[in-house]
From Swiss-Prot:
Gene name in the database record: sec14l1
PRELI/MSF1 domain span: 3-175
Pfam families the record matches: CRAL_TRIO, CRAL_TRIO_N, PRELI
Gene3D superfamilies, alphabetized: CRAL-TRIO lipid binding domain, GOLD domain
Protein name according to UniProt: SEC14-like protein 5
SUPFAM superfamilies the UniProt entry points to: CRAL/TRIO domain, CRAL/TRIO N-terminal domain, Supernatant protein factor (SPF), C-terminal domain
Amino acid sequence: MVQKYQSPVRVYKYPFELVMAAYEKRFPTCPQIPVFLGSDILQEHKSEDGALHVVERSCKLNVDAPRLLKKIAGVEFVYFIQKNTVNWKDRTLLIEAHNETFSSRVLVNETCSYSVHPENEEWTCFEQTASLDIKSFFGFESTVEKIAMKQYTANIKRGKEVIEFYLNELISQGITHLPKWTPGVPAGWHPLQAFRSGITRSNQAEQTASQGPCKADAGSHSLAAEPSTPDTDKLEADYIERYLGQLTPMQESALIHLRQWLQETHKGKIPKDEHILRFLRARDFNMEKAREMLCQSLSWRKQHQVDYILQTWQPPRVLEEYYAGGWHYHDKDGRPLYILRLGQVDTKGLVKALGEEAILRHVLSINEEGQKRCEENTRQFGRPIWSWTCLVDLEGLNMRHLWRPGVKALLRIIEVVEANYPETLGRLLIVRAPRVFPVLWTLVSPFINENSRQKFLIYSGNNYQGPGGIADYVDKEIVPDFLGGECVCNIPEGGLVPKSLYQSDEDAEMSDHIRLWTETIYQSSCVWKGAPHEIIVEILEEESVITWDFDILRGDVIFSLFHSKRAPDTRQRELALAAGNAPSSNVQLIDKSWTLGVDYSRVQAPLVCREGESIQGSHVTRWPGIYILQWKMHSSASGSSMARVDDVLASLQGSSHKCKLMYYFEVLASEDFRGSMSSLESCSGFSQLSGVTNTSSKSHSSSLISR
């Protein structure tokens, strides 16, 4: 398997020429990088105008590998070929490197670039990508891969420190600004040489005077740019550290790769970085597992309109009076603090009075509010806060709370929260746990993720008041009064729900299962091999607009739009509707006896849609009549004589016989439609989760006129 690395954008608040002078101090040897033993120049070229300088070097590295492995391989050192291309005119440096040793067995490719910051020409940006592909290595492929990745990630951080070291060395020598390239400079021109020879000192003095005080003052200058939320599709390292926390190089790379994939497949609208990071953490930064989990969650949010819950959900009066939970300041780490007096909650009464769905909606609104508070606290405290603390008081917990339907509802709610709000719980403090608690814990703990269970701290009796108690995590000033503190906690006291508020038997039966929003506009369907799913759309007026919005939940499909001269037989669909199977049934409308181009025609070019993609589009009809939306399984051989690697892997995994999708379509009358066709947006939005990117390299929105 090919291992890939993508760095965030690292910003130096120094001009490009000064950063280049620091970079070139690494050659031919660099004591600050022990594994780098030296380099020899193989080729060198300078353009006549001095704008371009190309150097190709052979670099000698001492890889920290077991001596036995080195002996088997028969090498003591590893050699790389590095080609550096400096363009002084454009102020860019491109570094291309690949391994020379064992190039037939191991392929290592690295590309780095230095360039001027797009918003400040006195700053310099650095980016880095690399790939590792081990074809064979004497049966030690896995070992070599681990060693190589360990060495590489260790040197990433070291490389930044080396640049900072040499920048500080230059500043200590009084070199804080170097001249830029200008037409007419002597052949072999170099900024540092020009500075030292005094060729352009007068120009530099004029430039410094026009720019005001020097930005590179050693006493007050920082090597890192002030972090800001990125306005482009690229993440900056300082932004990650400021808003997302300390990540290892490979964790940063996983975040960037998953974010790029979402940008390409979700039409420029993607979850916020902190939410993507939560799913990566939940899957130990395994990008494929995190991608699958995140896509399922995004589809769930869209289908049940969870993004709008804070705007639309109003807790019933019963919850406001008898649900003993609420937000209460923050803990010592700045995390939002939620307090739940579970022992005072009449779980049976709430379920009987409201049903499971209302309780689930309330729990979801709490989680959405928690994410919002984390963002606010991040800005308030100046450090990344992406989880909250929950303090659960079990005083009053008894066998009444082990009511079987209530426990079942709790377990289902836990499953929903674990799947869609991973890594949001920073710490769970359980206080005054009674003797009955182990019984409840035995029932609940198997449904809680192992990472979440490790964050639980359980106190029985009054142990929470002693050393190691809640005072270690919550300031004494905000410890609730019912736990012996001085702070008044404004949450309901709970208590028994009056039976007069219970639902009738009919209402209780309707609330027997968690359904969330039954009025969801999305439908689900499966696509089988040889059995596409098709929808008939009847258009009464020409120039009407057919819009669609669908998500591919499993497998790859081909989406097409047809205009039919014949009316399809809809009896199969009517039978499915009568059987109540419409949401997930597969309906085929185009008769096998029909001929494409005679009985029906294609008006929308086939679009291959990959698993996890979110597709939105539109079509302006030229004629009234019957239109058919079709989703059929994508064959790896379609349109190509060579099968894609992804398709082969999918078939080997046994998932190639069934696809699943979630879709919505609508017809807009021509007089009701306003705006550009390509501006049609999905019917869902990530009101709490999303950030909109400026560009998307792959847009699935279309606006075609029938021909």
